[in-house]
């Protein structure tokens, strides 16, 4: 396992396997890395996991690495499968369900303060 390090100019190298998984519910775990103006999260959802409707000021890009997520956005259903990307503008309400065991990368600009300070109660629970 490689160790995280920062260069003299501030570039950060952080292997995922050095970041502890944060369990949010029995069906949802995550890890994240925060830069100055951006954040990337590795999210692991078990089949049936529901991310309740919410919105945030952060622009979001979700890239599904494996599995599939069903999103409800603006009255539409969008299924995002492995290798596919969904861009969600700032303040747009959205909800998701894992159709199968899924791993995705979520990128946020700016970083999610509620995730960093653990006030993201909508994610913490049984589903």
Language model segments and positions:
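Short, conserved beta-strand element in jelly-roll/cupin
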Residues: 44-46, 56-71
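Short histidine-centered beta-strand/loop micro-motifs
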Residues: 24, 31-32, 43-44, 51-56, ...
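A short, N-terminal "cap"/entry segment at the start of jelly-roll beta-barrel domains
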Residues: 1-37, 120-127
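Structural motif
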Residues: 61, 68-70, 77, 93, ...
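A cytosolic small-molecule/anion-sensing beta-strand core signal
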Residues: 65-66, 81-82, 100
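Short acidic-glycine-tyrosine-enriched beta hairpin
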Residues: 75-90
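Ligand-binding loop in jelly-roll beta-barrel domains
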Residues: 90-114
């Amino acid at each position: 396992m490689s160790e995280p390090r920062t260069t003299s100019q501030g570039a950060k190298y952080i292997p995922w396997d050095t970041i502890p998984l944060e369990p949010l519910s029995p069906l949802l775990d995550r890890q994240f890395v925060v830069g100055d103006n951006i954040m990337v999260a590795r999210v692991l959802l078990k089949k049936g996991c529901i991310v309740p409707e919410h919105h945030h000021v952060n622009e979001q890009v979700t890239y599904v690495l494996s599995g599939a997520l069903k999103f409800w956005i603006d009255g539409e259903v969008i299924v995002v499968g492995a290798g596919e990307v969904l861009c969600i503008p700032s303040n747009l309400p959205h909800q998701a369900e894992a159709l199968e065991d899924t791993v995705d990368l979520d990128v946020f600009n700016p970083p999610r303060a509620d995730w960093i300070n653990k006030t993201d109660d909508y994610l913490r629970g049984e589903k």
